[in-house]
Amino acid sequence: MEKLSMVTSLLCAITVAVLAVAVVSGEAAVVEHTFVVHEMNATHLCNTTKIYVVNGQFPGPTVDVMEGDTVVVHVINKLPFGLTIHWHGVRQMRSCWADGAGFVTECPIPPGNEHTYRFNVTGQVGTLWWHAHVTCLRATINGAFIVRPRDGKYPFPTPAKDVPIIIGEWWELDLIELDRRMMDGNFDDNPLSATINGKLGDLSNCSRMVEESFILDVKHGESYLLRVINTALFSEYYFRVAGHTFTVVGADGNYLTPFKTDMVTVAPGEAIDVIMVADAPPAHYHMIALANQPPEPDPQIPVFTSRGLVRYAGATANNNGLPVPMPIMPNQHNTMPSYYFHANLTGLAHPERHRVPMHVDERLFVTLGLGSICRGQNTTCKRRRSPETIVVATMNNVSFAHPKTTALLERYYDGTSKGVYTEDFPIRPPRPFNYTNRDLIPPGPLEEALEPTFKATKLKRFKYNTSVEIIFQSTTLMQSDSNPMHLHGYDVFLLAQGLGNFNAKRDVRKFNYHNPQLRNTVQVPRGGWAAIRFVTDNPGMWYLHCHFEFHIIMGMATAFIVEDGPTPETSLPPPPPEFKRCGNNGLSQP
């Protein structure tokens, strides 16, 4: 945890209170927190950087609740610009107003203002997380959101302790400047290091000053529930502990069939629960978080690594004079371990589990790609070959135009959407093509032939209780990227994933209808596809986007409108009294 300056510490001592009101019983409780969001200086790698944090912490405070509790978080914005807080993976049943998606469900909280989020957590158990949902602020404004079973029982032996393992990135570049640069089409900036729970690790150093590592203290023979969360803006990560194995037991707030592995792969937005038994000889063991990279000759980025330590009780300070074991990591250019890890996970079948909808009312085939548009009002530029173009990310050739002064949910609820958005998001690409043809890697004549791309705020409307199937198809237009697609307000059945082009005649037979994973973030593999289904049982405005930050900024997003059901209990209620409408609220965005 970064240390505050003396002035900030005094300010926090006077003004910051973190309240946790819980009833130690079987009854639901109200869990209350106050988040003060502010700037803070932090020094790493011989440089002092201004970062943005909650309550002086990086990562921020953990929200720890039981299933069925009501969560109340008071956010006080001391930043010079607006922000929102998104409760990543919380289903927000009939509480879309509290989802915290900037300019989708609410306008950002203006500087110097406060906002209260209030929602219930029902039907979910496991690890979720929270983060800022405007610009690139989630790189440092984030934290774990833990939902415990109300009866205290797990479908696996109760661990001695559970520990969030929050994998992130350390940016020397100011995050607001990073956002501005990406908005202008500059995607060449990179973080300096990976982090584990805010620590860069002892592989990072400058002038022989070694960075601090995260240390996990364990006792021999005990088991530990590691809640591995990827908060990074840019990279998927491999995570390993030397001399130890894991049993994967959950993901995104849902239980999984226990799966044994010696490495966890976690994409941006994902939360993976694993059990680690401390069964090695008592000593010290290194843990590694390594960012994977696309295979060469695709565009390369620096290798980001953070090294931590598992320290057994009773082990000597110098590890008995022996070298500390290092885990053997895969080649950072090898993306196949990620594919096999995700493809081997299945949901834990139990009587109360929701069933996969076998009948499909609406089908979408969504290609994930790149395109280019003309800058400003210019409409005559020659696409990629002109300096007047800007590269954008697309879904079915549409790059999402994010609102800048209003919230989509507010306009939908008030019936004032004209001129703000349209409801014609395409359910398939303009024309089929060989989506994984390597000759499509841009720039090139084949890629240019697939233009034009449209920049627009196009949404998709669904009636209540509609069964929806979506096939996400990655394309080589994305060059080398996988795509962790996150849908707000829903858990979706991940029926299957595959490599190459999706072929219904061949691939539908691979669908897992018995025990698929329930996920809020679905990893669409590089050069492959993923199939999901869900039922629109949660009315409101729900954001769908890739969780790579540069893909969001480039426009790989849309929103789903889910209409009210036939009864008050199946309809979106009016905004709560504490909800602040957009209007003339002094909004100041970076």
UniProtKB/Swiss-Prot annotation:
GO molecular function per UniProt: copper ion binding; hydroquinone:oxygen oxidoreductase activity
Major subcellular location class: secreted
Reaction(s) catalysed (UniProt annotation): 4 hydroquinone + O2 = 4 benzosemiquinone + 2 H2O
Residues carrying covalently attached carbohydrate according to the record: N41, N47, N120, N205, N344, N378, N397, N434, N465
Intracellular or extracellular location(s): Secreted, Extracellular space, Apoplast
Keywords: Apoplast, Copper, Glycoprotein, Lignin degradation, Metal-binding, Oxidoreductase, Repeat, Secreted, Signal
Cofactor(s) needed: Cu cation
Gene3D superfamilies assigned to the protein according to its UniProt record, in alphabetical order: Cupredoxins - blue copper proteins
Its EC number(s): 1.10.3.2
Positions with a binding annotation for Cu cation 2: H88, H131, H547
Uppermost EC category: oxidoreductase
Secretion signal, residue range per the UniProt entry: 1-28
GO BP annotations listed: lignin catabolic process
Residues annotated as domain Plastocyanin-like: 36-152, 161-315, 424-566
Domain of life from the UniProt record: Eukaryota
Family in the record: Belongs to the multicopper oxidase family.
UniProt name for this protein: Putative laccase-19
